[in-house]
Amino acid sequence: MHPNVYIPEAFLEKIQTILPAHLNMEDFIASCQKPLRKSIRVNTLKISVEAFLERAEAKGWKLSPVPWCNTGFWIEADESVVPLGNTAEHMSGLFYIQEASSMMPVSALFMNDESYDAVLDTAAAPGSKTTQIAALMNNEGVLVANEYAASRVKVLHANIERCGVRNAALSNFDGRVFGGWLPEQFDAVLLDAPCSGEGTVRKDEDAMKNWTQSSVVEIADTQKDLIESAFHALKPGGVMVYSTCTLSTEENQQVCHHLKETFGDAVEFESLKDLFENAEAALTEEGFLHIFPQVYDCEGFFVARIRKLTAVEAPKVKKRMGKFPFSKASNKESAEIAKQLQNTMDIKVPEDSTVWIREKDVWLFPDALEPMIGELRFSRMGIKIAEAHKNGYRWQHQVATALATGDEKNAIELTIEEAREWYMGRDVRPQNIPADMKTGKGEVFVKYEGAIIGLGKWVSNRIKNGLPRELVRDKNLF
């Protein structure tokens, strides 16, 4: 795929000095020039792995399991007519296109089938790991998904929405603020740190065009600040995973050792030798995974699992929050909203969520978020479920993506032609209307092959399209 991939000579000389004895440079260079296998992760918030495998087989997709992620698969699929990203399964959130090695940090975070109430994803966009965490949390507790680059928060939200995540709170800060603003708040923290990207040449032949040793050192300084802040944000007894898609020891082992030197006995490295079969092929003496691309035929990657054994003194910070624009709904309001949602949409408000109001907008926040409200300014929290109007509530798209299952009484199955029309933003006139379904007025879920794809409104014998404009596609659909 990339026989002419650019690899600086100075970088190759550096790799020669850190390559483990059982590996060789010829294989390293050959693997960098080899095409990266495409991989996907099944989104178990929407579908079981077993049900997805049946759908994949029917489509002629060949899947082989990723050993470190029981929902991850390498995929061989004919994309000459329809790219994977334009398949109905992808658009309805049944799977996420995710590089196999990037599934490993989240698997390490949940290595022992842990259950966490509060998780921080420090550098979250575009959302592959965030949605993976949400699935392992089963949409319970709270997941704070932070992204420093404002331009990427929109993409992060789009992926969270598509995948049916409802326990997330999004923020847009430099990751270095969390230790001071939310000290010892999280049961688990993922720090997938910004890095020099030395492991990504199989995906991007120009990834190393601007590589210099001085830039590696500069990035490592930022990573040390980030890992300190992440450690401060972690509760005593909590677990942090530090990961990068780079190979240099300055950005990997040395960052972890910096944490140990800074906080001493409060830091414990936990071995990842049992994370998956043959993990020892990439294991360092500390128990980290330092993955060169030829070992598992994937991107270069680094993963460390770290436990915080004792509390540490939080940094002193000043912060100005401004007025919080939401108010908690009264018991009466909450009961009325829950009643109408049940009566009109056959949906129950989740027990671990609370209704909050901002002007006419109605939101559901995860209960586990409440201790953080007023401590950090979030750009988006939970899911928007309705807008209040004089005649009741107008339900929103996230009721379909995050709350509906497809088994609701007012969910109607579309044909493939109708589903294509729907994704192109057009109203549909369904051919197959169940005899017991009331038509003519009211809101209705639409689904395709059993998966919910949106929320519309009956207008006579047609369903008015309620797809948000940013989700409308115009061609090349399944």
Swiss-Prot record:
Keyword terms: Cytoplasm, Methyltransferase, RNA-binding, rRNA processing, S-adenosyl-L-methionine, Transferase
Keyword Cytoplasm part of the UniProt annotation: yes
Function, as annotated: Specifically methylates the cytosine at position 1407 (m5C1407) of 16S rRNA.
Enzyme active site: C245 (nucleophile)
Binding site for S-adenosyl-L-methionine: A123, A124, A125, P126, G127, S128, K129, E147, D174, D192
Organism, scientific name: Vibrio campbellii (strain ATCC BAA-1116)
Protein name: Ribosomal RNA small subunit methyltransferase F
Protein family (similarity comment): Belongs to the class I-like SAM-binding methyltransferase superfamily. RsmB/NOP family.
Chemical reaction(s) catalysed: cytidine(1407) in 16S rRNA + S-adenosyl-L-methionine = 5-methylcytidine(1407) in 16S rRNA + S-adenosyl-L-homocysteine + H(+)
Database matches in PANTHER family: 28S RRNA (CYTOSINE(4447)-C(5))-METHYLTRANSFERASE-RELATED, NOP2 YEAST -RELATED NOL1/NOP2/FMU SUN DOMAIN-CONTAINING
Gene: rsmF
Enzyme Commission (EC) number: 2.1.1.178
Any single GO CC term annotated in Swiss-Prot or TrEMBL for this entry: cytoplasm
Enzyme class: transferase
Molecular function terms from GO: RNA binding; rRNA (cytosine-C5-)-methyltransferase activity
Pfam families the record matches: Methyltr_RsmB-F, Methyltr_RsmF_N, Methyltranf_PUA, YebU_pre-PUA_dom
Subcellular location: Cytoplasm
BP GO terms, sorted: rRNA base methylation
